[in-house]
């Protein structure tokens, strides 16, 4: 794959002839823009993004302020890095900030039809309404309680039968993948372990492409430069594999007209979408490609977010033995005489819920959220922001804001025992799942998986690092991607707990 340095050189070379066309008019130059770092000709501030952009942008924002203006290639970009600025924008200008930029990999892999990346407009409104009312309603999420319980039980059995340390990263990804497969497709997998592994591999490659660097996202007039990025062929390959998979899933569901699946309580996600597709009263006609786009939303968000969060939680608890002990004592004191923690127990596990919140603060799944785009000119704190500006909300930086958090770099779950701050988009100090119209509608889908799995892992086992490793050896480095995973897999020794 061509290196980023070579790409920058090629960009400089090929854009020389387009300088005049890319220059902004004089009137726009006179705009009072937010402060930002000096930019290079042609590439702007692209060279300052680094391999983990949320970290680089946090560093730059510490120097230039919580509202920062960058030029990423030919794309004007606003970076929001404090709770105060997030509150100003999303309380007073949410509709203006609800657009989405056109991103190459997301458009291709999502059939231009995902709810997450759809432009702000009628299609997005109608599909989001369908998702909230039909797929993510409290009643629908509750209907899958048995699926979550059964899959967590299988996870516990796998761990109990293991000899030696277990790769918790792989096990939790398999857990969330199986849960989403059953909820979305009606089956744990379509034909066995090999097929489940295939789905898992497709999702990993999809995540890699969504987090990949495609030149056209920063130089829209130079789309042909994508061929030099080294990702184009990989993107097309995974798209074909996914498309064939989703085609087969839809065909199987259309062919399956058994009475067992006719009741709403037996419907999976594909059943619901096919039913809605046939409804003549729908405001928009839904195509098969749009059904596939919704499935991409559910698979990508439903598997990666939950599994990454569970691993960050277990990693932080290993690093903080007192917190681990308190969490285990809480769940073991509450749940007695039962083999497993059930979802009805979760509301009483206040400390464990605080642990989850603290980890979402320190390790938001998508630290820059999904990029937004301003739909019209607007003024923020006296700064004039032009339409079509891309917006990056640095949720990680906001959650580390010392104006809002005491000792923000420390792992302190206790802070949430006395604080009403939550992660559902109502508090601007913490936005791991976004805020406003474009906030993630699937948070209530993912969190029962995280909490049920975590509570049972702590209830059933004592955990420690493999022999010979100390807390100081636990690698907490982040991996590159649209969802931030722990780079090194988490291997732990599990000892069954005996009351």
UniProtKB/Swiss-Prot annotation:
Lineage: Eukaryota, Viridiplantae, Streptophyta, Embryophyta, Tracheophyta
Record keywords: Heme, Iron, Membrane, Metal-binding, Monooxygenase, Oxidoreductase, Transmembrane, Transmembrane helix
GO terms, molecular function: heme binding; iron ion binding; monooxygenase activity; oxidoreductase activity, acting on paired donors, with incorporation or reduction of molecular oxygen
Name of the protein described by the UniProt record: Cytochrome P450 71A9
EC number from the UniProt entry: 1.14.-.-
Cofactors named for this entry: heme
Similarity annotation: Belongs to the cytochrome P450 family.
Subcellular localization(s) per the UniProt record: Membrane
Primary location: membrane
Membrane topology value: Single-pass membrane protein
Transmembrane segments: 2-22
Keyword Cell membrane: no
Cellular-component GO terms for this entry: membrane
Induction of synthesis: By fungal elicitor.
Signal peptide as annotated in the record: none
Domain of life: Eukaryota
InterPro entries: Cyt_P450 (IPR001128), Cyt_P450_CS (IPR017972), Cyt_P450_E_grp-I (IPR002401), Cyt_P450_sf (IPR036396)
Chain's gene name: CYP71A9
């Amino acid at each position: 794959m061509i290196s980023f340095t070579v790409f920058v050189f090629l960009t400089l070379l090929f854009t020389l002839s387009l300088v005049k066309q890319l220059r902004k008019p004089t009137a726009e130059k006179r705009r009072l823009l937010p402060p930002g770092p000096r930019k290079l000709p042609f590439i702007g501030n692209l060279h300052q993004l680094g391999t983990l952009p949320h970290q680089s942008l946090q560093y730059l924002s510490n120097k230039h302020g919580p509202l920062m203006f960058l030029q990423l290639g030919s794309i004007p970009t606003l970076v929001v890095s404090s709770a105060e600025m997030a509150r100003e924008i999303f309380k007073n200008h949410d509709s203006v900030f609800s657009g989405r930029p056109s991103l190459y990999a997301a458009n291709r892999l999502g059939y231009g039809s995902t709810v997450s990346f759809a432009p702000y407009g009628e299609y997005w409104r109608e599909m989001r309404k369908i998702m909230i009312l039909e797929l993510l309603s409290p009643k629908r999420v509750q209907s899958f309680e048995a699926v979550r319980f059964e899959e967590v039980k299988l996870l516990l059995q796998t761990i109990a039968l293991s000899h030696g340390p277990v790769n918790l990263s792989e096990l939790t990804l398999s857990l969330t993948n199986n849960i989403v497969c059953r909820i979305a497709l009606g089956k744990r997998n379509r034909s066995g372990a090999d097929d489940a592994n295939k789905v898992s591999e497709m999702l990993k490659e999809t995540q890699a492409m969504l987090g990949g660097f495609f030149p056209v996202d920063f130089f829209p007039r130079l789309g042909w430069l994508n061929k030099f990025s080294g990702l184009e062929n990989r993107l097309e390959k995974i798209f074909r594999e996914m498309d064939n998979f989703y085609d087969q899933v839809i065909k199987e569901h259309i062919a399956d007209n058994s009475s067992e699946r006719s009741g709403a309580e037996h419907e999976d996600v594909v059943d619901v979408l096919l039913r809605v597709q046939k409804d003549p009263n729908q405001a928009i006609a839904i195509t098969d490609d749009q059904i596939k786009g919704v499935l991409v939303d559910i698979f990508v968000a439903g598997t990666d977010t939950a599994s990454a969060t569970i691993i960050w939680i277990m990693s932080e608890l290993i690093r903080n033995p007192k917190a681990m002990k308190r969490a285990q004592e809480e769940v073991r004191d509450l749940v007695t005489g039962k083999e497993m923690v059930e979802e009805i127990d979760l509301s009483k596990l206040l400390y464990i819920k605080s642990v989850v919140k603290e980890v979402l603060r320190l390790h938001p799944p998508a630290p820059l959220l999904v990029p937004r785009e301003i739909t019209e000119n607007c003024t923020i704190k006296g700064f004039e922001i032009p339409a079509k500006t891309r917006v990056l909300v640095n949720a990680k930086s906001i959650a580390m804001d010392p104006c809002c958090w005491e000792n923000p770099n420390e792992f302190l779950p206790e802070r949430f025992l006395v604080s009403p701050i939550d992660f559902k988009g109502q508090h601007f100090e913490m936005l791991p799942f976004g805020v406003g119209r474009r906030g993630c509608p699937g948070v209530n889908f993912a969190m029962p998986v995280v909490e049920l799995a975590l509570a049972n892992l702590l209830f059933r086992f004592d955990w420690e690092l493999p022999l010979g490793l100390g807390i100081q050896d636990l690698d907490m480095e982040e991996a590159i991607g649209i969802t931030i995973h722990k780079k090194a897999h988490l291997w732990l020794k599990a000892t069954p707990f005996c009351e």
